[in-house]
Amino acid sequence: MPTDVLVVGAGPAALAIAAELAERGLAVAVLAATDPRDPWSNTYGIWGDEVDALGLGHLLEHSWSDTCSYFGSGSSDPADPANSPTRHGRDYGLFDKTRLQQFWLERCEAAGVQWIRGLAEELSHGSGRSQVRYAPALAADVALIEARLVVDASGHKAVFVQRPELGPVAGQAAYGVVGRFTAPPVQPGQFVLMDYRADHLSEAERQEPPTFLYAMDLGQGRFFVEETSLALAPPVPYATLKQRLERRLAHRGVAIEQVEHEEFCLFPMNLPLPDLDQPVLAFGGAAAMVHPASGYLVGALLRRAPVLAAAVAQALRANPAAASAELAQAGWQALWPPELRRKHALYQFGLEKLMRFSEPQLRAHFSTFFSLPKEQWYGFLVNTASVPELIVAMLRLFATAPWNVKAGLMGMQGRELALGMGLILTR
Ligand SMILES: Cc1cc2nc3c(=O)[nH]c(=O)nc-3n(C[C@H](O)[C@H](O)[C@H](O)COP(=O)(O)OP(=O)(O)OC[C@H]3O[C@@H](n4cnc5c(N)ncnc54)[C@H](O)[C@@H]3O)c2cc1C
């Protein structure tokens, strides 16, 4: 059967879009370097309200109602009010990776997705169709597959999709451990989104780029603790993060007893949007869909895959002779409409600011941000608020922020001005 859409990749983005396209009756093939059934190594977290709105709460392995962050100055005195947590009042969950993968795999298989193992190498467009040359996993030769449209879902280092070069890309870096500890590293039953306390560091170290602890109780004596740098170019090295994690724990009298799994996390936070007039479409990390202010992606994949698949299916049916460029065009418009592009520009502008903030500024900023009404900070973090709603939230943040944060928000440095202009000019 001729292929309508060839999806490249076998991560969450590839499976999500392949399932949605195939369920709309399209002939879909997935070309992946690895077996799509190979277990994923990343842990994926999501807010409870976000997963509930998608009706997918059953895909979670863990969830927490006791969710908080620490933005105080972090003296070691527990009686110090600066040590009290900011309570988020919203549930947070971790996906069961196997169940999430299975959820998409089963839908792909039921809808007849064809699996091809190989490394995509070259893309060309002839007679209005797309041809992909790939190195098959089980043969020495190069093979060719033709499709009406190619969707590049090969992750952040995308194989085909092109984007403008706009300078250094900031990476979110983290080093984490799932394991057992000599004492609970967080309160039993607790999820900590960001612990910015830094009293385990010297004054000189506190001048270096700040990092925070992301941590959770997994039950039965197991915890996940991860030292994280929100975003930096070049990224904070793993060795620094590991050392900071160990020192943070030691400062609280906690040592790692048994390592079950180590997580090395690095992905780009502010990739420029791809060119929206190219004849190949993209989805997921390849399409710069990671939220530039939080690093989250999975919720966006689940929300946006049906919208994109519907647009592609409609374009294919509307014009059975449509060329790849035309189909990709319909897809890009659905994936990155002006409203989402404006929001992306706004988040990128915000991230640029945060990357310049000192440790006290960051703590004060986040403390103010999470004091906003819950709908406002949640709408910002999950990308469900409209542009006007985001602007209202940001104005409120500015009005209620302390002076050190106001000063940081007002001063324009580096490429902030260009990003701000981009925000105004996005159409
Ligand atoms: C450690 C870590 C933790 C994260 N935690 C979260 C989280 O909690 N919540 C969240 O929402 N996001 C999280 N993210 C961010 C984001 O969700 C992930 O990076 C996500 O895996 C990106 O999905 P993707 O499908 O776009 O790309 P990937 O998962 O990177 O998948 C790319 C796929 O393409 C294949 N491929 C690549 N090149 C080729 C080629 N030439 N030919 C054929 N196949 C190819 C690869 O083999 C792979 O199967 C995390 C990221 C990391 C690294």
Give residue spans per PLM region.
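Predominantly flavin-linked oxidoreductase catalytic cores and closely associated redox partners
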Residues: 110-255
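N-terminal Rossmann-like FAD-binding beta1-loop-alpha1 element of flavoenzymes
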Residues: 2-30
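Short beta-strand to alpha-helix junction loop
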Residues: 85-107, 153, 231-240
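Helix-loop-beta segment of a Rossmann-like dinucleotide-binding subdomain
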Residues: 74-96, 129-131, 218-232
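N-terminal FAD cofactor-binding segment of flavoenzymes
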Residues: 20-73
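Long, low-complexity C-terminal extensions of enzymes
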Residues: 306, 310-427
